[in-house]
Amino acid sequence: MNEKESGREHTGIAAEMKVLLREPPLLIGILAVFLLFAVFIIYPFVKILLVPASADWMRAVTDKEFIEVFSHTIFSSFVATATAIVFGFIFAYGVNYTNMPCKRFFQVVALLPTMAPSVVSGLAFIMLFGRRGFITWEMLHLKVDLYGPVGLWAAQTIAFFPLAYITISGVLKNISPNLELAAQNLGAKGWYLFRTVTLRLATPGLASAFLLVGINSLADFGNPMLVGGNYHVLATEAYTQVTGAWDLPMGATLSVFLVIPTLIVFFVQRYYLEKNSYVTVTGKPVAGLIRVTAGPAATWCFFTFCMLLSLGILMIIGVVVLFAFTVSFGADYTFTLEYFKEGVINSNVMVNSWVASMSTAAISTVFGIALAFLVLRKKFPGGTVMDFLAMLPVSLPGTFIGLAMILAFNDGPLEMTGTLAIIILGMALRQLPVGYRQAVAGLKQIEGSLEQASTNLGAGSFTTFRKIVLPMLKNSLSVSFVYAFMRSMNTLSTVIFLVSPEWNLASINIMSLANQGFLPTASATAVGIMLVIYLTFGVVKLILRDKINIFDL
């Protein structure tokens, strides 16, 4: 950087500071955000790095057992991620690029697993294919043991397939048909057209899906705990070291090592997308163009695949429901509410989860919109740092965040161990990036001149934010709120270290009950979570008068 450029930079910073000094509430708000980030993000993450001694780091990289656990984590995550992305792409392509029937049915079924805890797929796997599973034992009389890498692969593929489908479908739906039609007019067709045009334009969606599914499968705790058997991964091993071996430094060490592959996935995805261009430069799409679709034979192949996968998803959810409401599934199919009463009505875990999730959704949504407003609409020194810190939790495993929280706030003036506050804090931190990015996307669609006019009329930044920005972001706010609530109700890895006997959560209770063999009660609790999510979503739709629909993908 030469002296001229350096001078311009200093002049720009000075001008930004003058603007902030003329508006003290804005300056105080920015400083408050940085203070919150320092206390609740930087401090816990530094704390977890300082707990392990050099001997712990050395043991983690030399001990054969831990090396094996690390290799298990990478392998199982890669296989599950690859399968989920392939399934998600085929499903999304069938919905968006064919004329197959039942598209609406497929769209709804593909999203059903997102409203259930990810551990439900593992729970259903035990019921259907476990040592006494309904299919393997009751129907086929087979003595098979599918616990381990195979069971983990199947459970994680079903659990995270919806993430891949949602991400890829959004990209495929937004691809303009202009380029595909132009390529077709130039003689490209079939596989060549798909490979050179459609697949290339879908690359950002595939990369984003790889990031989302990869990070979630790496950090998955419930499925490895239920169906992993002796096939240990980093998330479960870190938990075992802390709660079983009482070795907190080693648990912290393994949690930090779990961050390494997730950060690699995150930065590789960012580098690959920045290195290559996927922007269509044909201007606005021409109205009335019809998308190039697959032929009849291919369409029926896609229909068959989507139907089989949808039936598999319905079977998983169906068996959980049947276990919850029958006396003894496989032997006595008499309807009963006893398990539902035990797991939902007579237990406080569902109320705890609802209160924590509603609080988390409100905090992450409002704070995310406020952050987006500051970063996008206000120029101030440190805006890039604020943006980075707001997005940092998306690349961190839940077990890492949870353990960092418990280490940071176990004592001292901000002691929160065993309270509802630390649970909400951990979940809000995990959901903040989603609310922030949703608000950023919404703000980019709003003309900045509206806020400028408000400022010119004498309104301050906070008045403009409250009276102009918030009303115009109502839909974005609603989507963020519903998504954060849904994910918080289902969260497991983030809160596994944060719950206490007084403040236990429904998702944790499912895993605990399943591990003890109480599968019907665990199933009833899972059904309870799904019902709470559906009811909450219905209330939001009623309030907004059908202006939000998460099934429109």
Where are these regions (language model features)?
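Helix-loop-helix hairpin linking two adjacent transmembrane segments in secondary transporters
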Residues: 236-261
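Membrane-water interface segments at the C-terminal ends of transmembrane alpha-helices
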Residues: 21-55, 64-173, 199-222, 253-270, ...
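The alpha-helix within a helix-turn-helix
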Residues: 183-184, 454
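Short glycine/proline-centered loop/turn elements that form peptide/ligand docking sites
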Residues: 175-178, 446-450
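Juxtamembrane inter-helical linkers in multi-pass membrane proteins
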Residues: 189, 276-292, 329-343
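Transmembrane alpha-helical segments of polytopic membrane transport and secretion proteins
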Residues: 1-32, 270-308, 541-553
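A short amphipathic helical element positioned immediately N-terminal to and/or at the very start
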Residues: 14-20, 55-62, 335-344
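Glycine-rich helix-loop "coupling/hinge" segments at transmembrane-helix boundaries
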Residues: 221-245, 332, 492-519, 553
